[in-house]
Amino acid sequence: MPNANQASAGVGALKEVLPGIRALGDLEAAEKVVKRCSGGSTVMVCVIGSTEISRVPGISAAGKTPESTFHTPAGDVELIYYDRIINAEEVPQNPVGAPSPAVITKAVVNLASIPFLTVDAGAAVKPACPYIDLGGEVARDFREGPALSEETYDRLLEFGKTLGKELTRDVDFLTVGESVPGGTTTAMAVMTALGYETSEKFASSSHDSPHDIKERVVKEGLEAQGVEPGDLDAHEAIRRFGDPMMPAVVGIIYGSRTPVLLAGGTQMAPILAYLAEEGQLDPERVFVGTTKYVVEDEDSDIESLFRQVGDYVLFSADPGFSESKFRGFRLYEEGYVKEGVGAGGAQVAAALKTKGEITPKDVLRECERVYERWMDKF
């Protein structure tokens, strides 16, 4: 159940555990995670999906227009595989021209030689790259009814378990990212339905988080489905208000034989809430990695959100963009882009795998090289 006494705002103590990586939350558990995973092997999976919520005007900046958000997940992973887009309509970027955080993911998996796999949990546009199909579907606008059918939810959960088991046969830890435009709103809806305090807690892909739009849409959704905050368990809250990434990732965690690094920001809160409800929330086994832009975001509060759920470990990654020669990267420093495609967690995974040999300067240099290749092709 939500811990109301842990909902206060404010950034807690941060401790640098690796170059460019700081830990928050349970610092003792964080040190154990670093010790256990340092030098270990990993594979990164990016779970892609879509929700009709992303097409609500003003709710997501993960695309130049609301309609283009359906193309963003495919474009993100195509860029990581091929340095160009194929099935997507355009290079994923927000309306002010900042590049997709896929550039960070691409750079750090290159630097650390981390295998990268795409998992389709229900993307509207399928990517032109190899991917594992979990048989999902685009999440419905929860103001019009449950986001996912029982059949789809159950299939994503069970297939996720099988996948998690197979992916961790020969690695030391698993890294799981996501690309779901509109996902902070579905996450907010799930957490509200579970009874958590969510007002101004969730980050956004836009510079000025559209809290009023998100809160209005969530309120309309709960009213349409006759749900009061705290009415639902995690299963029903995710099925009725979530997106296809959520049951897929829960399943992957349950199937995993190793610790799991959740590469994402506030969108990972429903995953932690599900585990907490089942008595399975262990910060040494499941921990979160995100960018410093989420942790330091003045328009959201990931820490107070996670504190309500229970004990947690949160790693904050700095890609060094303040020193970039490209304006698009410096826009991250101004809050125009914060997270996506597992960017922050991917950097954490790279730092863990290499025992801290990859620094923010290395990340920035590789990001700029990747970005230049992308721009040469468009």
Curated annotation (Swiss-Prot):
The lineage of its organism: Archaea, Methanobacteriati, Methanobacteriota, Methanomada group, Methanopyri. PANTHER family: PTHR38811, UPF0284 PROTEIN SLL1500 (PTHR38811:SF1). InterPro entries: Nict_dMeBzImd_PRibTrfase, Nict_dMeBzImd_PRibTrfase_arc, Nict_dMeBzImd_PRibTrfase_sf. One of its GO terms (molecular function) is nicotinate-nucleotide-dimethylbenzimidazole phosphoribosyltransferase activity. Belongs to the UPF0284 family. It holds the Pfam family DBI_PRT. This is UPF0284 protein MK0224.
